[in-house]
Amino acid sequence: MKKIEKTLDEWRSMLDPEQYQVCRLKGTERPFSGKYNSERRDGIYHCICCGLALFDAQTKFDAGCGWPSFYAPIEDSAMIEIRDTSHGMIRTEVTCARCDAHLGHVFPDGPPPTGLRYCINSVCIDLRPRD
């Protein structure tokens, strides 16, 4: 997969302020505030920055954590996992494999079949109908 590389100024001009803060500066939207937290429509969730397909809506579940949660990415190659020791915690950050956008974190407390919970910021994703 060909990487997309832009300067922070280029990303800032493409994204709204909240998208920029979360995707490019590794921020976090407030829990229960994101437009996809309670979303139930079918489709594919794509990276808001580069359009890469990230999650199938059929893998979304209600974790009660305040952010959209998925038990698996659409392809393992769509994500990069990075050890995150910020805020006095040890977590695993997930970023878009194509543009390095911060998406959220993955935790080992999800449902079968993976046992994983990809906790994703709504501002980082875009739900599109299936082709």
From Swiss-Prot:
Q: Which residues form the MsrB domain?
A: 8-130
Record-level Gene Ontology MF annotations: peptide-methionine (R)-S-oxide reductase activity; zinc ion binding
Which PANTHER family did the record assign?
METHIONINE SULFOXIDE REDUCTASE (PTHR10173), METHIONINE-R-SULFOXIDE REDUCTASE B1 (PTHR10173:SF52)
Name the active site residues: 119
Give any Gene Ontology cellular component: cytoplasm
Top enzyme class of this protein?
oxidoreductase
* EC number of this enzyme: 1.8.4.12
Organism lineage = Bacteria, Pseudomonadati, Pseudomonadota, Gammaproteobacteria, Pseudomonadales
Q: Tell me if Ubl conjugation is a UniProt keyword of this record.
A: no
- In its UniProt entry, what is this protein called? Peptide methionine sulfoxide reductase MsrB
What is the gene name? msrB
The similarity annotation says: Belongs to the MsrB Met sulfoxide reductase family.
Which GO biological process annotations does it have? protein repair; response to oxidative stress
